[in-house]
């Protein structure tokens, strides 16, 4: 007997996840994107990473046929942008500082990390698709605290001792400032 979907959603909501924008271009060169909390490193040799996308997403046809995609890992102050990219009808690229990389990807300027991939493989996975990418380029910012999503909301990245990472990477008290 399969697990209850509601209970599974509740259980998975308890798993903290980073938040990223995943972007690709359609055949006409128009950028498309979605918000993902399913960005995962798979292998270092060869360098592989994956994202998952619902088959019902408006951008599904683009990602089901693209040859490349990029992942912009969001900072904690990018939550409005994360919500915009999670909606079906939003003009996702209006506002926000998007730039083109040397490889041609559209990425968020100021993301804590950017990972550019060529599609290595696509795997059907129930009502989703797993997009496995071979990492071609990585850029990491030295400053910035990553966005975290847990219990169906954005949360601060803090230790049990009450220290939150600062933009310099050192812990600061959760109630400071």
Swiss-Prot record:
Q: In its keyword annotation, does this UniProt entry include Oxidoreductase? A: yes
Q: What protein is this chain from? A: Actinorhodin polyketide dimerase
Organism from which the protein derives: Streptomyces coelicolor (strain ATCC BAA-471 / A3(2) / M145)
The record's section on SMART domains has:
Flavin_Reduct (SM00903)
Coiled-coil residues: none
The record's annotation in Pfam families points to: Flavin_Reduct (PF01613)
Q: Which Gene3D superfamilies match?
A: Electron Transport, Fmn-binding Protein, Chain A
Q: Which UniProt keywords apply?
A: Antibiotic biosynthesis, Oxidoreductase
